[in-house]
């Protein structure tokens, strides 16, 4: 499995409209093999969300496209930003440096 983190932030003045869209189910669905395993929300001034996904190794490219398509649908909200980050476990990273 591959892990992908998506960091999202948006300003408070769009929160109500953003949440209506988020809860409406109108955003493109994730591919069935993309599993969100964590979602954390916190706030400083902006609302910030951290999502962690699992994607099978052999579906990585298609999974990343699916995640990108979903999050791109939120960019119509002024101030909404997201970043997709491919991650690996520490033990996998150490192997790269041996």
Residue ranges and their predicted role:
Residues 1-65, 85-98:
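Short S/T/G/P-rich N-terminal loop/turn motif that feeds into the first structured element of a domain
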Residues 72-88:
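Conserved short beta-strand edge segments in small beta-sheet-based binding/regulatory domains
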Residues 27, 69-73:
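Short, intrinsically disordered, mixed-charge
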């Amino acid at each position: 499995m591959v892990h992908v983190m998506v960091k999202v932030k948006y300003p408070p003045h769009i929160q109500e409209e953003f949440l209506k869209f988020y809860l409406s189910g109108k955003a493109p669905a994730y591919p069935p093999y993309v599993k969100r395993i964590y979602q954390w929300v916190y706030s400083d001034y902006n609302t910030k969300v951290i999502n962690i996904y699992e994607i099978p190794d052999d579906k990585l490219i298609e999974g990343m496209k699916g995640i990108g398509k979903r999050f791109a649908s939120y960019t119509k909200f002024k101030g909404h930003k997201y970043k997709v980050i491919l991650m690996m476990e520490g033990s996998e990273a150490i192997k790269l440096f041996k």
